[in-house]
Structure formats: structure tokens, C-alpha cells
Regions:
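Short, cationic low-complexity segments
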Residues: 110-138
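Structured, solvent-exposed acidic/aromatic patches
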Residues: 1-117, 188-189, 194, 206-224, ...
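Active-site-proximal region of nucleotide-activated glycan assembly enzymes
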Residues: 232
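Flexible, polar/acidic helix-loop-strand segments at domain edges
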Residues: 139-224
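Short amphipathic alpha-helical surface micro-motifs
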Residues: 66-76, 120-123, 130-132, 153-159
């Protein structure tokens, strides 16, 4: 029934990037169908790899106006609903606002729960000291724990995060390591496990957010990057001529952002 409902509403939806930000357009419909087809074999026993390729391709059509954000970190900052580079990658967002849409869930949870008072400022004055990373995630960026920099800075604590990104050669390695251990040995000790800095209530333009506690940061529910990943997997699973090359080109587009 999900497929039939998506088919029935498509023509009533706005063209790509023509809906108000935060409302679903046709690209959101196509991306959800691509997700559905990627997992069709699980649901129905019948693979639909080519349909997944087709609908991911519809989302990725350059004429739609969507594109990859050149700065990964800005996708998860307070002005991701205003910053043109971030907005162009976000197909559908869960809207957040520190004044108009206060909630103890959403991006507030993602920022406050990963924050401690000794960490770099991330735009909230309410650190909860709950969530940090397991080493399995860190291992995706550092095959050898000895390569992780544990630098300390008194004034510019964000420089530690930049050191980690530089050592990992990956801007997604948004970890804070000062005073931390890579191994999560004690669940009740916040400094066991690296702190995760992906989400913040800071703005890319340096201006203040609406509220010092509750974030403005929208949650990118559907992003263009997902369409690349769906199509790459579908290419490989479908097989055939140039399958590996086509999949690699989609992954390379993400790696080269």
C-alpha cells in the first residue's frame, strides 16, 4: 500500500525544490520509492534493483536543483534552513526552532545528550553528558587508535576537532578527544568513548541562534546523499556491465564533496 499511496500523490506534489522548505516535494516521493525498491526483496521476495536505480536517478537529475553541500558539517548546523549550500542537499527536513518549536527531542537531544561542559561551544547551555561514541565508529576513521590525536587547547577547543579531522583525512570525523579514551570501558563514565560533535546549534555565518538552549538545527530527514548510496548499492546488486564502475562513481561523488 505504501507504493500505491506514493503513486497516487506524486502528481499532487510540488516540483523539486518548489515546496516551502520542510515540506515534501516530488523528489521526496521518488527517494522514498527508491528506498522501498531497494528493500523490495525483503518485503516481497522479489528484487527491484532496476526500479531503485531509476527512482534514485530521478532524484539525482541535475535539473531538479538539488546538489551536495560542499561542507558536510554545515548540514547539521543551526542555519541549515537558510544556508544555500546546506539547503540544496536537504530534500526533506524535520523543522526545529529554538523559539517557535521547542522540544526536548529532535536536534536538542542530539546536541545536548552528546555535550559536556568541558567541550567546545556547540550553541546550547544545557549539556546532558549522556551519549558518546563506541570504538567501532571511531575505527571507521582510524584503523590504528595510536593515530588519533588527543591534543589539548585552552582557548580554541574546536582546534582539537580540526586536528582529528586532519588526522583522519575526513571532514566527517567530528570527534572531540581531549580528556577522552577511545575505548568505552565504563558505560557510566562520559569520558570513556570519544565525544561526537556532528550536531550543533552554531550558525555557519557566525550569527547567534534564536535561543541559547533549544537549537534551531533542522534534522535532514531525506538528503541527496542517500540517493547516491541507494543507486550505488542497487547497481552492485543488479550486476551487469559496468555495475562496479557505476557504483564507484556514485560513491566517489560523495567522497569528493
Amino acid at each position: 500500500y505504501i507504493k500505491s499511496e506514493l503513486e497516487s500523490i506524486e502528481n499532487d506534489m510540488s516540483e523539486p525544490r518548489q515546496a516551502p522548505f520542510g515540506r515534501a516535494d516530488k523528489a521526496a516521493c521518488w527517494l522514498l520509492r527508491a528506498r522501498l525498491y531497494l528493500n523490495a526483496e525483503v518485503y516481497t521476495g522479489q528484487p527491484r534493483w532496476n526500479d531503485a536505480i531509476t527512482y534514485a536517478g530521478k532524484v539525482l537529475d541535475p535539473s531538479n536543483g538539488y546538489g551536495l553541500c560542499g561542507n558536510y558539517e554545515q548540514l547539521f548546523m543551526a542555519d541549515n534552513d537558510e544556508n544555500p549550500d546546506a539547503k540544496k542537499e536537504i530534500i526533506l527536513s524535520i523543522r526545529q526552532d529554538g523559539v517557535q518549536a521547542k522540544s526536548y527531542g529532535g536536534s536538542y537531544f542530539l546536541i545536548a545528550a552528546t555535550q559536556k561542559s568541558d567541550m567546545p561551544n556547540r550553541g546550547t547551555n544545557d549539556p546532558w553528558e549522556c551519549i558518546r561514541t563506541r570504538k567501532a565508529l571511531v575505527d571507521k576513521f582510524f584503523a590504528n587508535s595510536e593515530d588519533i590525536p588527543f591534543t589539548e587547547y585552552t582557548d580554541n577547543k574546536w582546534q582539537n576537532v580540526r586536528d582529528v579531522q586532519a588526522a583522519a583525512k575526513d571532514e566527517r570525523a567530528l570527534f572531540y578527544t581531549t580528556g577522552r579514551k577511545a575505548e568505552l570501558e565504563s558505560v557510566g563514565k562520559f569520558t570513556d568513548g570519544l565525544s561526537f560533535m556532528k550536531w550543533s546549534n552554531l550558525r555557519s555565518d557566525g550569527q547567534p541562534a534564536h535561543d541559547a538552549k533549544i537549537p534551531d538545527t533542522d534534522i535532514p530527514f531525506f538528503r541527496l546523499a542517500e540517493a547516491y548510496l541507494i543507486r550505488a548499492e542497487a547497481y552492485l546488486r543488479a550486476g551487469g556491465a559496468n555495475a562496479q564502475q557505476n557504483a564507484w562513481l556514485d560513491i566517489k561523488a560523495l567522497r569528493d564533496r
